[in-house]
Amino acid sequence: MSSILLGVNIDHVATLRNARGTKYPDPVHAAEIAERAGAAGITIHLREDRRHIKDRDVRILRETLQTRMNLEMAVTDEMVGIALETKPEFVCLVPEKREELTTEGGLNVSGQLEKVKAATQKLTEAGIKVSLFIDADKEQIDAAVECGAPFIELHTGAYADAETEEAQQDELKKIAAGASYAASKGLIVNAGHGLTYHNVEAIAALPEIYELNIGHSIMGRAMFDGLEKAVADMHRIMLGARK
């Protein structure tokens, strides 16, 4: 079975920094440690309200990352403009509501097909690889294909938040079916949202999954074990699921 990559989301380093309006902890330093520990890429979400990652972080990380940047962003003219100026290796288009604590669901690509398609085309023409953050739903997967995005990221939030083992298994089956269907359509399949050290193994074991993007649980573990160990431990669990 092929290997699997870990993308580390460092948004919550910025959340902690912004809580006091200080210059520390610096997401740039966190990215350096995560890369050293085995991260294949660094994910950051530049939200419209700038609640954690700031424009300054995007600029500096683009210059300093040794791996690659995955810039999560809403489908707006402002964000597309920032991406075209910054030119990250990857952009992941996500839904966004100002009142939410975190991204609550997948992007409704089929419901705004022309808008997403236009953004995807602009970014692709600039040499940026585009991923769409969607639920494991055939309609959304088909819409992603129509948009011309080479990657999707399957939303694993319902799986992660399931309150019973039966419910979690049902969600896992949906993700597995979605990953298989997307791969059959020629898409490269990533996944993420809500994944922890306790629930990641089953998702990592799905053969179609190319990369997992994980942040909150790694940063939580890092408070006690240190960031380098937290990243390395997550990567080890993921790789173990592929043996």
Curated annotation (Swiss-Prot):
The active site is at H45 (proton acceptor), E72 (proton acceptor), H193 (proton donor). Keywords: Cytoplasm, Pyridoxine biosynthesis, Transferase. Signal peptide: none annotated. GO terms for cellular component: cytosol. One of its GO terms (molecular function) is pyridoxine 5'-phosphate synthase activity. The record marks E153 as: Transition state stabilizer. It is found in: Cytoplasm. SUPFAM superfamilies: Pyridoxine 5'-phosphate synthase (SSF63892). One of its GO terms (biological process) is pyridoxine biosynthetic process. Its EC number is 2.6.99.2. 3-amino-2-oxopropyl phosphate binds at N9, R20, G194, G215, H216. It catalyses: 3-amino-2-oxopropyl phosphate + 1-deoxy-D-xylulose 5-phosphate = pyridoxine 5'-phosphate + phosphate + 2 H2O + H(+). 1-deoxy-D-xylulose 5-phosphate binds at D11, H12, R47, H52, T102. Pathway: Cofactor biosynthesis; pyridoxine 5'-phosphate biosynthesis; pyridoxine 5'-phosphate from D-erythrose 4-phosphate: step 5/5. NCBIfam families: pdxJ, PRK05265.1-1, PRK05265.1-2, PRK05265.1-3, PRK05265.1-5. Belongs to the PNP synthase family. Catalyzes the complicated ring closure reaction between the two acyclic compounds 1-deoxy-D-xylulose-5-phosphate (DXP) and 3-amino-2-oxopropyl phosphate (1-amino-acetone-3-phosphate or AAP) to form pyridoxine 5'-phosphate (PNP) and inorganic phosphate. Homooctamer; tetramer of dimers. This is Pyridoxine 5'-phosphate synthase. It comes from Aliivibrio fischeri (strain ATCC 700601 / ES114). The lineage of its organism: Bacteria, Pseudomonadati, Pseudomonadota, Gammaproteobacteria, Vibrionales.
